Amino acid sequence: KSLTAKYPKVKALDARGQYVMPGGICAHTHFYGAFARGMSIPGPAPKDFPEILQKLWWPLDRSLDAEAIRYSALVSLVDAIKHGTTTLIDHHASPNCIDGSLDVIADAVDKSGLRGVLCYEVTDRDGLEKANSGINENVRFLKRLSASPHPRLAGTFGLHASLTLSGITLQACRAAAPEGTGFHIHTAEHESDEYDSVSKSEMRVVD
């Protein structure tokens, strides 16, 4: 009653005894993963996470074009709306459609009315040229938002995982990132990530 007295012009809804809660926040997702729902992996079942990457996720992200990126984002955003999630961090990858890919996703987020933090996941798995393209896409999008801020969009700098990133590429990302930029990265998703990190640096992934 105190709220209705304080805001007499605001429309009141009968929640019928249910709770009203703030919107949920998804701190990590891959919109393009919408295409993986119900998808079976050809051949024998993957024995571990690296095989899941090689047999499912990497063939999937290599198949994406601008239209597929747009529709996978829209499907994921509709799903978020239905489940009360209002803010999402999307970790995007489309090795054969890198340039401008974050703009396609940003347009979908804008149309949805939700909030999004977007980045492109840089990786060495597709070669140096595409790693550099991923770096450039992150920087371009961050500069776009800096020059023309959006009330519901933000950017961060995406990295796949330390096991698919060389020290040289990591240094290039750090050098390219605008001052104050945060990084979004997979960490310790499987033992192989830990072993790779220890062999490269004698430190675990999060050390």
Task: Describe the predicted segments one by one.
Residues 28, 84, 186:
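Residue-level signal for inorganic ion chemistry
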Residues 18-40:
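Di-metal (Zn2+ and/or Mg2+/Mn2+) metal-binding site signature of metallo-dependent hydrolases
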Residues 2, 72-76, 137, 204:
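Well-ordered alpha-helical segments embedded in enzymatic catalytic cores
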Residues 92-207:
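Metal-coordinating catalytic core of metallo-dependent amide/deamination hydrolases
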Residues 43-101, 161-169:
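Divalent metal-binding segments
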Residues 1-21:
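Histidine-rich, glycine-flanked metal-binding segment
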